[in-house]
Amino acid sequence: MKIALVCPASLPATQFGGIVFLSIDLAREFSEMGHDVTIYTSDLDFANGPTKFNKDLPRLEKFEKFKINRTHTWFSVKLYFVNPNIYKQIKNDRPDIIHTIGLRSFQSLMAWFVSKQTNIPLVVSDQGGLTTHPFLKQSGIFFKLVYKIQNFFIKCIINDSSAISAANEYEKEIFLTFNKNSKIKIIRNGINLKTLVSQENFKQKYKIDNKFILFVGRFSKSKGIETLLYACSIIKNELKTQNVSLVIMGVDFGYQDEMLKLINMLKLNDNVIVIKNPPRDDVIAAYGQSEFLVLPSHWELSPLVP
């Protein structure tokens, strides 16, 4: 079977988060089963920031047993990446089935257009962006209007889909608010343990002598880093614990400057190690050597950490 996986970002932009890992894992598993799998995506690369696109990335790249088809992003608004040529690429390749991930994306809109025009079955998944995202409540009038327009198209995509894959019962209920008759199957997110092996000595590389607690994620207000730093301050000042460090690994999504100021204000510079834009291998190595991982997010749908 010829399978098209459609998503806003893919390799090498691992810092984008769960959608990247979900699509890669699906592509890996489907291709191992003998299917012809292509990921259609943007050319986001995260080399210099969360909205940096790279024309030098291969347009078509073979990775393991599947392919990644990248088209250039003309412009972006927040995490909405507009790469119109993705429509032509999917349509010309004539897949047997299209599976799109991340319904607030331009890429899902294009996948729906192709499906509707060619009668190719459409499977949809999301990864936390439908109704629970804090941007929906915190944004100004313009973006609230944009989200309402998006909701119209999301409802169309859901109504026309052949099947919906939800990560858990909570996400299933969110989908049902758009269409009570949706064909929903709960397929929980998994982790490929083979990808969680690293030869890197993380503590040696970053000169960490203490035991450390680990946070991995976007530097975003919604990830709860502020709460984590105040907790770290309590551990240091009230519990008088000096031999444990906090390692924060991730990429800036608008909160980095405020986070660094808070670290300085709480006098945690000697206790907190911030690693910006870490290589994936370093992240995996950190998982193995940390005492434990913390997930202080204000909300999560079905987190793909690690």
Feature locations, PLM:
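Nucleotide-activated donor-binding/catalytic signature segment of Leloir-type glycosyltransferases, i.e.
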Residues: E258-D281
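Glycosyltransferase donor-sugar binding loop
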Residues: F46, I191, V216, S245-L260
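Carbohydrate-associated surface elements
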Residues: Y170, G190
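Membrane-proximal helix-turn-helix segments that form the acceptor-binding/catalytic region
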Residues: F113-Q117, L130, K144-I164, F178
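N-terminal subdomain of nucleotide-sugar transferases
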Residues: M1-K55
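Short alpha-helical donor nucleotide-sugar binding micro-motif in glycosyltransferases
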Residues: N277, A285-S290
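A conserved mid-protein helix/loop that constitutes part of the nucleotide-sugar donor-binding site
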Residues: F21, K211, F215-K236, D257
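Aromatic "clamp/platform" in nucleotide-sugar-dependent glycosyltransferases that forms part
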Residues: H298
